[in-house]
Amino acid sequence: MCLLMEINNNANNTNTTIDNHKAKMSLVLSTDAKPRLKWTCDLHHKFIEAVNQLGGPNKATPKGLMKVMEIPGLTLYHLKSHLQKYRLGKSMKFDDNKLEVSSASENQEVESKNDSRDLRGCSVTEENSNPAKEGLQITEALQMQMEVQKKLHEQIEVQRHLQVKIEAQGKYLQSVLMKAQQTLAGYSSSNLGMDFARTELSRLASMVNRGCPSTSFSELTQVEEEEEGFLWYKKPENRGISQLRCSVESSLTSSETSETKLDTDNNLNKSIELPLMEINSEVMKGKKRSINDVVCVEQPLMKRAFGVDDDEHLKLSLNTYKKDMEACTNIGLGFN
């Protein structure tokens, strides 16, 4: 019971002290024509405690503050205006804090950006040095490739020129062979010499078609000489001329032997048979004249024989063909 009495006494004492404090707290008004309330430090501290009890400036209301504070003479108008100012101050502080935080974050971002820029600058310098080396290597490789391509193009052009020249040479030889065959086809006589020439021309044409234009002309000249000798001997006039040549040669040899014999006889019998020597000399003069006459007769016969026959045209065509073939070989050597 004693304890209960003490607790009640303490409570009464606290209430009395609070009432005394409220009574002591008097409002301070300004001396203007329209007096205004001055918020002292104690009054403002009391206001802050009441706001915190109500849950902060956003939840506190002027009526709630009036009930909590319980100060006589304090009106809703005074609490409302002071609460608005308090809220503005809090918001300004909050904005200032935000600005400080944002400025700090911005400073950090700027510093991070600067650091990243520095790192990028170092990496860029390294990358710039590496691409420079790579660029030099690429340019050298491109130059080498261009040189190789130029050499290949030059070789291709040379091969084209050689191919064109070889084709032109083959066409020329084919045209020459066609002309020779046409000239041979114009002759109506079908003797062995013509057949032989045709076979040789066909053989040369086949060689040209097979790609052997630069054949040796020794065979061709040998064939032509054999053909000319065969054709010349085949003529009846030429046969007579050959017989005359043989007879003249035999007579000349016999006359020479007789002359040598007579010279020896004359040397032995000079002093004895002078008239016989004169007779023999006259006889020998007559024999020489007859031999010269025979030789003189032989030459126009040969000229007439070579100038009349149609086979002479064949010889001329073969000679021209041989010259054309020699010219073709010279052209081929010039190409090579």
Curated annotation (Swiss-Prot):
One GO BP annotation of this record: regulation of DNA-templated transcription
Chain location of the short sequence motif LHEQLE per the record: 152-157
Basic and acidic residues composition-biased segments: 110-120
GO MF term list: DNA binding; DNA-binding transcription factor activity
Residue span of region Disordered: 100-134
Coiled-coil regions listed in the entry: 139-159
Record-annotated disulphide pairs: none
Assigned GO CC terms: nucleus
Subcellular location: Nucleus
Domain of life the protein comes from: Eukaryota
Keyword terms: Coiled coil, DNA-binding, Homeobox, Nucleus, Transcription, Transcription regulation
DNA-binding region, residue range(s): 62-87
Domain spans labelled HTH myb-type: 31-91
Family: Belongs to the MYB-CC family.
PANTHER family to which the protein is assigned, alphabetical: MYB FAMILY TRANSCRIPTION FACTOR PHL11, MYB FAMILY TRANSCRIPTION FACTOR PHL8
Protein name: Myb family transcription factor PHL8
